[in-house]
């Protein structure tokens, strides 16, 4: 049972927060954590953790508390915390292992089930070609949160050159015409649309 927690954290001391978190993860040999730094607000981080069981999550949380991890970050606040599950991935379990950048798009959605089905079709059509261009795709849906009807598309991007193209021109430039038809069908299902773009601080794996 794979699930995850995604946290958005605004740090008072970004470098200290990154260093303390990285050192803590290294000390405990954690391979299941990704950290990205916003390219527009460099004091904002996305912190994603992947778990294979609830017991793993509880064990790691206890390690965090015992080390006073949050207290040692130098101050800041969590802007959002969500429990999520991956439902579509072109590189299951490895998408965040080697990317240099991460683009995340999504928000509240009027029909999460249909969006998941459409995203699966898009991956069937274009998933491999995007992988060949250095872009892995993950879709996540919320398990908890307010609101809960949210789903996000993550694009894990291998190189700065590709990241620049995605940032400026959008991911649609990398899709085929058949894939774009489904993308255009899916986009209106999001009732709120948010996008974040992050530079990798720490990869999973």
Language-model segments: which ranges?
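Short S/T/G/P-rich N-terminal loop/turn motif that feeds into the first structured element of a domain
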Residues: 1-205
């Amino acid at each position: 049972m794979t699930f995850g927690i995604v946290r958005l954290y605004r740090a008072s001391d970004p470098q200290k927060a990154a260093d303390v978190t990285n050192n803590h993860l290294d000390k405990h040999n954690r391979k299941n954590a990704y950290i990205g730094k916003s390219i527009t607000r460099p004091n904002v981080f996305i912190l994603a953790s992947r778990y294979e069981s609830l017991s793993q999550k509880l064990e790691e949380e206890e390690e965090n508390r015992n080390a006073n991890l949050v207290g040692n970050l130098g101050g800041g606040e969590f802007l959002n915390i969500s429990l999520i599950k991956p439902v579509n991935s072109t590189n299951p379990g490895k998408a965040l292992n080697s990317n240099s950048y991460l683009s995340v798009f999504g928000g509240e959605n009027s029909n999460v089930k249909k969006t998941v089905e459409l995203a699966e079709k898009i991956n069937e059509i274009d998933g491999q070609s995007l992988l060949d261009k250095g872009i892995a795709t993950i879709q996540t849906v919320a398990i908890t949160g307010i609101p809960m009807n949210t789903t996000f598309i993550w694009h894990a991007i291998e190189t700065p050159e590709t990241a620049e193209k995605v940032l400026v021109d959008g991911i649609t430039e990398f899709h085929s015409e058949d894939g774009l038809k489904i993308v255009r069908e899916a986009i209106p299902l999001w009732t709120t649309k948010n996008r974040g773009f992050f530079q990798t601080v720490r990869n999973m794996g």
